[in-house]
Amino acid sequence: MKTIGYAIVGTGYFGAELGRIMKEEEGARIVAVLDPENGETVAKELGCDVETDLDTLYSREDVDAVIVATPNYLHKEPVVKAAEHGVNVFCEKPIALSYEDCDEMVKSCQEHGVTFMAG
């Protein structure tokens, strides 16, 4: 089975908890997190790297997918940038706070041929 490398953007309660769950899943590996407030702490717990820039994070060869768990109003940038880098996306719900942002995020993922899931 191929191991999928996951990044997590936003390591508050939901992001950190999803990381803990994914760490135990066969075929999944948390490779890096990005969060200016508690990224270092969560990275240490998960045994992964810390990144401070979305472009650097998404340019990593070992990042196949990203979990976006930032505050709801901050979902758009990490989703659109992930799509631009060809990284598949799982985004916490709600996807965004406006129809326009949702539309832009979905269209960006479609345009770049990446999988976009919300939950």
Q: What do the predicted segments below correspond to?
A:
Residues R29-A32, D64-A65, N88, T115:
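Short, Asp-centered acidic motifs that coordinate Mg2+ and/or phosphate
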Residues E104-G119:
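Rossmann-fold dehydrogenase core element
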Residues M1-E45:
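N-terminal Rossmann-like dinucleotide-binding module
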